[in-house]
A protein has these predicted regions:
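Mature-chain termini and adjacent capping regions
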Residues: 1-171
Length: 171
């Protein structure tokens, strides 16, 4: 894990709150809400797939999105083990789809311990895939893998480098 889990109040019901406001007809009158120490949880039954924490953010009920700052996101594989752990400067979380975009010096750890860094990464919840088409470096047992992007199946832990992958061995 990149950061120690915090004891932040959980806003797992943020989507429900936003939906209630929108259904109440008051959504057009509600300005975006600035919140601090926020946590979003995407779960199905007892299984928590994704937890996104941010130091602060702006929740827009009109677009159903949260613009986040100082972000930590943690994904679980289907076996419940950590599959992907990411920190970044900024992020955008879609409250309706649970899609997530990490922006600004994205650093992460894959389930097998490999570390990576990239300028941005996107997570498509419906496909269970985290990906980037930006340059990425992955450190794995003394070697650095470089590519023009990657595709990572979060639920199964399978990684594929894309666009001109190369390996740099350390002497």
């Amino acid at each position: 894990m990149l950061a120690t889990a915090s004891k932040r109040p959980r806003l797992a019901g943020a989507l429900g709150l936003c939906a209630a406001i929108a259904l109440g007809g008051a959504a057009s009158a509600v300005p975006p809400m600035r919140l601090s120490k926020m946590t979003f949880v995407s779960s199905e039954g007892a299984f928590t797939e994704l937890t996104v924490e941010a130091d602060s953010g702006l929740v827009d009920t009109q677009s159903n999105r949260a613009q986040l700052e100082s972000v930590h996101a943690l994904w679980a594989a289907t076996d419940g083990q950590n599959s992907l752990d990411v920190v970044c400067e900024r992020g955008e979380f879609d409250l309706a789809t649970n899609n997530f975009v990490a922006l600004g010096r994205v650093r992460g750890v894959l389930g097998d311990g490999r570390r990576f860094e990239s300028p941005w990464m996107r997570y498509d919840h419906s496909k269970g895939v985290a990906y980037t088409d930006a340059p990425v470096e992955i450190v794995d047992q003394g070697r650095t893998l470089r590519g023009g992007g990657f595709r990572y199946a979060v639920r199964t832990g399978k990684l594929r480098l894309t666009a001109g992958a190369s390996v740099v061995e350390k002497p």
